[in-house]
A protein has these predicted regions:
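Flexible phosphate-sensing "switch/lid" loops adjacent to ATP/NTP-binding sites
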Residues: 1-323, 333-349, 356-357, 363-370, ...
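Active-site proximal loops enriched in glycine and acidic residues that flank catalytic Cys/His/Asp
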Residues: 11, 41, 214, 241, ...
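Cysteine-nucleophile active-site neighborhood
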Residues: 17-20, 24-28, 32, 343-438, ...
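Short low-complexity, flexible loop/linker segments enriched in glycine and/or proline
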Residues: 52-55, 225, 393-396, 497-499
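Short beta-alpha connecting loops at secondary-structure transitions
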Residues: 57-65, 243-247, 352, 373-379, ...
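Flexible, glycine/charged-enriched surface loops at secondary-structure junctions
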Residues: 272-273, 321-326, 484, 535-538
């Protein structure tokens, strides 16, 4: 393909319709046809990145290989397409404005008055086209966060309007709207969609394809009505009905001809429809699974999206073990020595989740002690690993006051300590150890056997690490340091070989797990959780 094609995904009526899933599905379908694609997300908030946002408000903060803290939708992009994203795939209004202001301070605008139009819109346009120019993608899919009509989204809509005009046949708009079902009237209502499209048209954008989110099936009469009132071809009105799994969406979109309609709009001969063989095999394997494996997530954020990548990695791993993964959230704030047996009852394995701050950590320590002493498969991630280390120090090494410097700066047994390069940092945003780092695994360790190699790369997001001053004591007592960064000598993985499955990682393996390539640690953890279930229940 000689010229990069640009697809803009916008949303209307309400937020949280699933623009990220639709963008990922579009990418998957085009990728299945052999095209080189990438997906980027523009978020209209003024934060530089979501790294300091409350998980209750924003959900999980996803980390790219090059260390960018991003929206959780980038996790969907990677899980669907198996393509790693970078800083260029995630933009916010804060970063756009900062870039423009920095240029103004540098004198790049030669004394001109800096305005939203053209300077902010030009910077948006530059970032949209950057990936196409720099990397030569066939398709660049750009998801615009928020909803048409939001004040925050106005500069992005103006930039899209200009790009559609400038790029002509090489640009296309997919608009996602909502068709509500009124139970009392027994009717599906298209008026919100019509108003959303009118709002889009009022800023100069005519949608090329409409995707209608709905809880009920839309018949052809409704689709024809929407097509007529919104100036969209009938075959370009696609419905996205609620499905049991987000991984069914690409197949559903393909069955309705979404990829075919897009290619025709671009003047490209669609050719033969791809089979999506490996993807469908995953879905078939998931559907055939009749047995369940129960995993408890010990954490402090009860919003499901706060641990989105962990949840998806566990679901994927369950499928590859021919089991359905059933997840139960266990609030660590409510865990005590007195109730832990009751709270963790019925779980075949436990994940001690990541997080920050004092709240809920003692409950994680309680969980780590219970699973260690009862030989329950346990997977500690980031802060979860640190709590496993602290619990071991308190109850095996005998350091009852052992803690992390994050929680107690004056603890004499700081088994978790702040990294040297972090000690003089005062800013919170974008200053942690972020992105992919190399890790060398100890020969003969369980994790080395799981990975099948000694050198790996995993993504990090933390300031605190295992204190190497205590390593010999830990290893003499049975907790082994089996993964290290070769440059800094930081401990990245601990395990207790004598237990069924007791592994903690300082990194976030969930970021590397995709539908077609599940992460080996999660697959092996689920396998041993299933084995534990058989031992307990026969």
């Amino acid at each position: 393909m000689t010229e990069t094609k640009y697809i803009f995904v916008t949303g209307g009526v309400v937020s949280s319709l699933g623009k990220g899933i639709i963008s990922s599905s579009i990418g998957k379908l085009l990728q299945a046809r052999g095209y080189n694609i990438t997906i980027q997300k523009f978020d209209p908030y003024i934060n530089i990145d979501p790294g300091t946002l409350n998980p209750y408000e924003h959900g999980e903060c996803y980390v790219t290989v090059d260390g960018m803290e991003t929206d959780l939708d980038l996790g969907h992009y990677e899980r669907f397409t198996d393509i790693q994203t970078t800083k260029a795939n995630s933009l916010t209004t804060g970063r756009i404005y900062k870039a423009v202001i920095d240029k103004e301070r540098h004198g790049d605008y030669l004394g001109k008055t800096i305005q939203v139009v053209p300077h902010i819109t030009d910077e948006i346009k530059r970032n949209v086209k950057l990936l196409g120019k720099k990397c030569g993608y066939d398709f660049v899919i750009t998801e615009i966060g928020g909803t048409i009509g939001d004040i925050e989204s106005a500069p992005y809509m103006e930039a899209i309007r200009q790009l559609k005009w400038e790029l002509g046949k090489n640009a296309l708009n997919v608009h996602l709207t909502y068709v509500p079902y009124l139970k009392a009237a027994g009717e599906l209502k298209t008026k919100p969609t019509q108003h959303s499209v009118k709002e889009l048209q009022s800023v100069g954008i005519q949608p090329d394809i409409l995707i209608l989110r709905t809880e009920k099936h839309l018949n052809d009469d409704i689709r024809k009505k929407v097509a007529a009132f919104c100036n969209v071809d009938f075959d370009c009105v696609i419905q996205s009905e609620d499905l049991p799994s987000i991984y069914e969406v690409p197949v559903n979109m393909q069955n309705q001809g979404l990829d075919t309609a897009m290619l025709k709009k671009f003047g490209i001969e669609p050719g033969e429809k791809p089979t999506l063989g490996p993807w469908k095999s995953f879905l078939e394997r998931r559907d055939k699974a009749t047995e369940e494996v129960h995993i408890g997530l010990v954490g402090k954020y009860d919003l499901q999206d706060a641990y989105k990548s962990i949840r998806e990695a566990l679901y994927q791993a369950g499928t590859y073990n021919d089991h359905k993964t059933v997840l139960t959230f266990i609030n660590s704030e409510n865990l005590t020595d007195e109730n832990v047996a009751e709270k963790l009852a019925g779980q075949d394995g436990i994940v001690i989740c990541p997080g920050f701050g004092q709240r809920g950590i003692e409950g994680k320590v309680v969980a780590a002690k219970y699973t260690r002493t009862h030989n329950i498969p346990t997977f500690g991630i980031c802060l979860g690993m640190q709590m496993m280390v602290i619990e071991f120090a308190r109850n095996v090494l005998g350091y009852k006051d052992a803690n992390s410097r994050e929680m107690n700066e004056k603890t004499p047994h700081n088994v978790i300590d702040i990294m040297e390069e972090q000690k003089n940092i005062t800013d919170m945003g974008g200053t942690m150890r972020l992105g992919a780092y190399e890790c060398v695994l100890k020969q003969g360790s369980r994790v080395c056997d799981i990975y099948g190699k000694t050198h790996i790369q995993e993504r990090h997001r933390h300031r605190y690490e295992f204190n190497n001053d205590f390593q010999k004591e830990y290893e003499r007592a049975g907790m082994m340091c089996v993964g290290r960064n070769p440059e800094s000598d930081l401990v990245e993985i601990v395990e207790i070989p004598g237990l069924n499955w007791y592994i903690g990682t300082q990194f976030h393996p969930e970021y590397q797990s995709t539908v077609l390539h599940p992460h080996p640690l999660f697959v092996d953890f689920i396998k041993h959780s299933i084995d534990n279930q058989k031992k307990v229940y026969g």
